Structure formats: structure tokens, C-alpha cells
């Protein structure tokens, strides 16, 4: 749940269409201080649902969808090489977990998938990767920002706790 903090704002809405399912997806990019951007996406067909970030389309094309989100991230990075990114991997809905042997304590299936993709696609030279597996938050913090002290893990953790009224603890992925 978000706090009443008005520093959170949606900077851009991006759209793309899947070449496989032909479904249109919306990517929301939220801007925070210190060049930090939160990335969210969902299928346009469920945009009014409170569960829009958790709903599965069962089209089995997550890699294509995530690659499209990464293209959005890269566009921000090309414009400003000091940007950092974060996202929350939405929890699986109860109906999607029925009958499946899934360890929800180590993060959602989405979280594990996103984590694997980010570690494989982005090296440690550019982004310091950290996470909170309990709350399925994944961060890619710009190394230049960290090394100059412009941002710290503690700053980001505090901001997450303030904005989303939570108790987030960021663990380093290195």
C-alpha cells in the first residue's frame, strides 16, 4: 500500500504489443529522487483490476515481455547513464498456486525469473544488484551513484519503507 507521499509520480507510460499473443502491455515507469525508476507492467486487458500486476495471461511468453521492459530501461539508461531501477515482482495469486509445489518463502515465481534474467543480462560493472526476497523487490543500483555516495542501499531501503509503508530489508546479490 502506498503512503500519501506526493513525491511518487508516474513519469511515462509505454506500450508494446506481443508478437505471439498480440496482446498489448502497459509499462509504467515511476520516477523517484536520485535518478531511481520503478518499473511495472501488466496486460492492458486487466488494467482496471486491483490484481493487474499478479494476473497471469497463460500465454507462456514471459521472456519476450521482460525483454520489452528491459528495452524501456535501456532507453532511460541511454538518456542518463546514472539511472537505477527497481521493481516488485507481484505475488502469485492463490488460484495460480493450487496444486503446485512452490516455495513461496524464497520469493514468487516471477521474482525468481526476473532475478535470473537481470543477473544474466546486466553485469556488476554497471549495476549493483540487491533484493528483498520476502517482499519480492529487486533493485539494480547504478554503480557510479553508489561509488560517489549519491545514493546508498540504506537510502533506498528507507525510501521504500516510507513510500510503501513496509519493513523492507535489502540484501546484496553479489
What are these regions (language model features)?
Residues 1-174:
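Non-catalytic substrate-recognition and accessory regions of acyl/acetyltransferase enzymes
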Amino acid at each position: 500500500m502506498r503512503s500519501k507521499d506526493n513525491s511518487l509520480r508516474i513519469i511515462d507510460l509505454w506500450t508494446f504489443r506481443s508478437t505471439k499473443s498480440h496482446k498489448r502491455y502497459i509499462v509504467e515507469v515511476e520516477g523517484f529522487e536520485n535518478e531511481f525508476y520503478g518499473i511495472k507492467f501488466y496486460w492492458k486487458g486487466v488494467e482496471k483490476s486491483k490484481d493487474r500486476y499478479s494476473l497471469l495471461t497463460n500465454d507462456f511468453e514471459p521472456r519476450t515481455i521482460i525483454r520489452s521492459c528491459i528495452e524501456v530501461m535501456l532507453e532511460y539508461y541511454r538518456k542518463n547513464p546514472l539511472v537505477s531501477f527497481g521493481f516488485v515482482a507481484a505475488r502469485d495469486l492463490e488460484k495460480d498456486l493450487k496444486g503446485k509445489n512452490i516455495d513461496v518463502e524464497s520469493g514468487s515465481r516471477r521474482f525468481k525469473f526476473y532475478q535470473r534474467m537481470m543477473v544474466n543480462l546486466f553485469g556488476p560493472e554497471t549495476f549493483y544488484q540487491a533484493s528483498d526476497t520476502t517482499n519480492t523487490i529487486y533493485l539494480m543500483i547504478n554503480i557510479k551513484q553508489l561509488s560517489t555516495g549519491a545514493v546508498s542501499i540504506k537510502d533506498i531501503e528507507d525510501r521504500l519503507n516510507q513510500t510503501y509503508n513496509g519493513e523492507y530489508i535489502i540484501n546484496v546479490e553479489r
